[in-house]
Regions:
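Short beta-strand scaffold segments in enzyme catalytic cores
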Residues: 2-8, 13-16, 115-122, 131, ...
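Active-site/pore-lining binding-face segments in mid-to-C-terminal subdomains
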Residues: 171-203
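Conserved mixed alpha/beta catalytic, RNA-binding, or beta-rich assembly cores of soluble enzyme
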Residues: 128-166, 172, 177-180
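Solvent-exposed alpha-helices and their adjacent loops that cap or buttress functional pockets
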Residues: 1, 7-8, 27-28, 37-41, ...
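Conserved short S/T/G-enriched processing/targeting/catalytic segments and their helical context
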Residues: 4-104, 151-169, 223-274
Length: 274
């Protein structure tokens, strides 16, 4: 499995992905999930992929040459698209092309056609945009109300993103938040693993030099891992324990209920709850 997160902010974009592929306990490999497409000064795009590795790799290859009919005009590719919307349409077409080639064979082998992508960036003359692409090639776009997307093992790392991120979050703070999200996922799920790829894009730059590969020896990620775990324990220990004896407390547990009653006990075979 994998875990990837993409964040769209007023200040720019943040992308983070792991690199573990799990096809069974004896078949764990390292494959990069991040692809960066850059034509400096004209366009900058990033794709993060999750799901079946063979499908994702096929989509990557076809995306480079995929063309959309444009009537009497030049066919649309990811390299000449005038908008990120057109670029993600090209990606969706590449996904559907792979399905047309391999979908029935995979189904006959009992394998689901499973892939999902986060695709974001900026094309000259347009604002930054970010999309979540599904297995059918359809997609949705990030908004001010939903400024991040996740693919893969998303549940472990989502709470910190929900609590911290807003469109006004600074880029470095968002990158830190993404790394905490990844650390939480690594702690709870063996199918996600190092090394990680982290990329930060500043709005309007149409290029990025802030890209790093993070392994087990990375000092900053080690600090994130140790500090986050320690501070969580400190906060947990600072919270009052529940009191069951009804004694005085600032935050009593055994408080009177306005509408509901505690769960009833069944004390003999003939008793019914209702």
């Amino acid at each position: 499995m994998t875990y990837c997160v993409g964040i769209r902010l007023n200040a720019g974009l943040v992308f983070l992905s792991d690199s573990r592929t799990n096809a069974g306990m004896d078949q764990i490999g390292t494959f990069r999930k991040m692809m960066v497409y850059e034509k400096a000064g004209d366009r900058f795009m990033v794709m993060l992929s999750a799901g079946n590795l063979s499908i994702s790799q096929s989509v990557r290859e076809i995306l480079q040459v995929e063309k959309l009919d444009n009537g009497d005009g030049e066919p649309i590719t990811m390299w000449n698209a005038k908008s990120m919307f057109d670029a993600v349409r090209v990606l969706g077409s590449a996904v559907r092309r792979v399905y047309g080639q391999d979908g029935q064979s995979l189904k006959a082998a009992g394998i689901d056609f499973n892939c999902s992508m986060i695709f974001g960036g900026q094309i000259k003359g347009e604002a930054m945009r970010m999309f979540l692409v599904y297995s059918a090639g359809n997609f949705i776009e990030a908004t001010r109300e939903t400024c991040f997307f996740q693919v893969g093992e998303s549940k472990y790392g989502k709470p910190i993103l929900d609590r911290v991120l807003t469109p006004r979050t600074p880029l470095d703070e968002a990158a830190k938040c993404a790394l905490v999200s990844m650390d939480s996922t690594l702690k709870s799920n063996l199918s996600v693993g190092l090394p990680l790829d982290l990329l930060v894009y500043e709005a309007g730059s149409l290029q990025s030099s802030q890209i790093v590969c993070i392994d087990e020896q990375n000092p900053y990620f080690q600090m994130i891992h140790n500090t986050w775990g320690q501070r969580l324990r400190e906060v947990f220990e600072s919270i009052d324990d529940p009191r069951w004896d009804g004694s005085s407390s600032t935050h009593p547990l055994m408080s009177p209920l306005q509408r509901h009653e505690p769960v009833r006990k069944i004390t003999h075979p003939g008793e019914r709850i209702v």
